[in-house]
């Protein structure tokens, strides 16, 4: 086992990364090894997908399968060995199909089929023990003693960034949005990473390419969500329980939320969003469901306590899931799509009867709690509509600064930095937030500036796209570069989606971003220095010191 993809990873003087019997996230060594093997198989598929594409052969099933299966290897997504093995076997079948199609296309074109790299020729074992014995072939740091640590760090930056992009591709696909050109570039990068490079410049360029690719993916996902559910609107949301039977929907998949709402209509069940699903409450399409009553709980890391106290059924539509046995609710939590946990019921297809039956069998909430409301829904359309008013308030001096404070949440005590930063932001500043990092402060009162709320919740982590559109619009209005705006980005990272959002921002030329609370363990000190020199990227320090720098206070 070697896994170093999330903030929780082990850090010691002897080296970084989880490499023992179990990772800090709860992932067993065998699961980690199988995930590495799956990635290796997917890279082999992408080699053939790329070569076949050069001859005009495109398999749309493969184009959607590879990102989806890759998504299953993200932090806190799938801990079920049998599901990972099934993905690996499916990858082997797709690779063989593409191999045949490629060779046939070569014959038709009168070309000789190329000799492809080992990753495209690897023969997957037929049993779990055999697959585990093959794991060293796919170990991410297998050649660590032969290469410079910066090369390994750059490879991992690319791999983990591409994982985040794969997740957004799958979210878009669920909403009917795919793009053959995006899929082709995705395969090219997967294939490149499958034949480990030692060229630092090429790896760095690839990291920026991944950021550019993800910008297009986020635009595609934004289109999928707004075409399906309308543009988010400023919406007041209750964050306290109401009396009645209950289902909690977590993750990011709004299509699943829609299906659950349709199937629970008239059955006396209240539906709540959780975590990154909170922004769904701002979409017009969901406002017709009176039994979508609000948001319950906070960010992913608190779920073992919050789910244990939730007297209903829970559905995990995507990341993040952690051990449900700790809170003894494994019999009433259900997984979907790429999510998996051993022993937890997995819902296949669009029928949520098993979830509904479980919710009806449970007590539900016995009384209404006193409401606590928050306002959400300041995504792209709402921000653009407010832009003239915002500009007027900037010009008259009422608004002097903007902060984008968001990203992933986590359980490290150092993350209180983000709460303290939001609290300490000057009263003449506006705070934009997105991702589950918002839960560090989204229930606090920040007031307004001439009717403009000082806290603007943009949405999910992928709604960084909305923030980028606002920044571009403001830079055009003020006729300046984005980096000349009175805007500072402070991003909390935990896993791979945050990595690819960061790469997206860097690839667009956004500078002087702060990230925290701790830098990714796979980034060497030298790589961190290079990123600081090139982009002004730096780690958070203290709220007082960072605010002085951001506000140019001497």
Curated annotation (Swiss-Prot):
Q: According to the UniProt entry, what is the EC number of this protein?
A: 1.7.99.1
List GO terms (cellular component aspect): cytoplasm
Identify the residues that bind [2Fe-2S] cluster.
3, 6, 18, 25
User: Which transformation does this protein catalyse, written as a reaction?
Assistant: A + NH4(+) + H2O = hydroxylamine + AH2 + H(+)
The enzyme's first-digit EC class, named in words, is oxidoreductase
The cofactors named for this UniProt entry are: [2Fe-2S] cluster; hybrid [4Fe-2O-2S] cluster
| Keyword terms of this UniProt record | 2Fe-2S, Cytoplasm, Iron, Iron-sulfur, Metal-binding, Oxidoreductase
Which subcellular locations apply to this protein? Cytoplasm
GO MF term (any one):
hydroxylamine reductase activity
**UniProt xrefs under InterPro entries:** HCP/CODH, Hydroxylam_reduct, Prismane-like_a/b-sand, Prismane-like_sf, Prismane_a-bundle
> Source organism's superkingdom?
Bacteria
| CDD domains named among the record's database cross-references | HCP (cd01914)
TM helices/strands, residue ranges: none
How, per the record, is the cofactor bound?
Answer: Binds 1 [2Fe-2S] cluster. Binds 1 hybrid [4Fe-2O-2S] cluster.
Q: Which SUPFAM superfamilies match?
A: Prismane protein-like (SSF56821)
Q: Where does hybrid [4Fe-2O-2S] cluster bind?
A: 252, 276, 320, 408, 436, 461, 495, 497
Q: What is its main location?
A: cytoplasm
Residues that bear Cysteine persulfide: 408
Instruction: Establish whether keyword Metal-binding is in the entry.
Output: yes
Q: Which GO terms describe its biological process?
A: response to hydrogen peroxide
Tell me the PANTHER family matching this sequence: HYDROXYLAMINE REDUCTASE
Family to which this protein belongs: Belongs to the HCP family.
What does this protein do, in the record's words? Catalyzes the reduction of hydroxylamine to form NH(3) and H(2)O.
Official protein name in the record:
Hydroxylamine reductase
Q: Please name the taxonomic classification of the source.
A: Bacteria, Pseudomonadati, Pseudomonadota, Gammaproteobacteria, Alteromonadales
Q: Which gene encodes it?
A: hcp
